[in-house]
Structure formats: C-alpha cells, structure tokens
Amino acid sequence: MPFQSTVGDYQTVATLETFGFLPPMTQDEIYDQIAYIIAQGWSPVIEHVHPSGSMQTYWSYWKLPFFGEKDLNMVVSELEACHRAYPDHHVRMVGYDAYTQSQGTAFVVFEGR
C-alpha cells in the first residue's frame, strides 16, 4: 500500500529578498534596515532590474557601491532617485560585507510593475 502524505504539495515560491516571506516593510522599518547596514560597516549597494528579468539576469547597479557611506539620508535619496529613473523596475538595497566578501542582507525597497 503506497504511503499517503498529509502534507500538502506546495510549490516553492520565488522571493526577491531576505524578508520575502514577511509582510511588506514600512518606511521606518526600511530606514532601520539601512541604518543597520551602515552600523555593521557594510557597503550599501543599490540594484535594479525589470520584473520580467528579476530571476533570470543579474541586477544592475545604480551608480557604484557606496563604500564607507555613513549618511542614511544620502542612501535614501539615492534609492528614491533610482526609483524615479526606473519606476517600473524592482529596486533593491544590498548590504555588502567586504570582510566576508558576501551580501550581509538584501531586500526590495520598491517593487516594479
């Protein structure tokens, strides 16, 4: 007799970010995450991509990574500038840890249409 599982057969859902399974973040929560990136000494990086290519292609940098940046308001203004320039793109904030040479965190700030 074949085994009948009681667990549903759920499809894996692709997510774009670290917090993809949580409710969308508020503006204050986004600011707190950016402040955390800066406090850890990580380099803020802004990336963007059209939604149609978000899973198949590399995301493009908005300018260069902000190495050594300590000003939260400057990072937020660059996020907003990227969103204004590419309103239909996903815009993601990445905290790059130079010591481990990896992403410390990544989350979508603006979702494209």
From Swiss-Prot:
The gene is cbbS. It is found in: Carboxysome. Heterohexadecamer of 8 large and 8 small subunits. Forms a CsoS2-CsoS1-RuBisCO complex. InterPro entries: RuBisCO_ssu, RuBisCO_ssu_dom, RuBisCO_ssu_sf. HAMAP family: RuBisCO_S_bact. PANTHER family: RIBULOSE BISPHOSPHATE CARBOXYLASE SMALL CHAIN 1, CHLOROPLASTIC (PTHR31262). One of its GO terms (cellular component) is carboxysome. CDD domains: RuBisCO_small. The basic functional RuBisCO is composed of a large chain homodimer in a 'head-to-tail' conformation. In form I RuBisCO this homodimer is arranged in a barrel-like tetramer with the small subunits forming a tetrameric 'cap' on each end of the 'barrel'. It comes from Prochlorococcus marinus (strain MIT 9313). SUPFAM superfamilies: RuBisCO, small subunit. Belongs to the RuBisCO small chain family. One of its GO terms (biological process) is reductive pentose-phosphate cycle. Keywords: Bacterial microcompartment, Calvin cycle, Carbon dioxide fixation, Carboxysome, Photorespiration, Photosynthesis. This is Ribulose bisphosphate carboxylase small subunit. RuBisCO catalyzes two reactions: the carboxylation of D-ribulose 1,5-bisphosphate, the primary event in carbon dioxide fixation, as well as the oxidative fragmentation of the pentose substrate in the photorespiration process. Both reactions occur simultaneously and in competition at the same active site. Although the small subunit is not catalytic it is essential for maximal activity. One of its GO terms (molecular function) is ribulose-bisphosphate carboxylase activity.
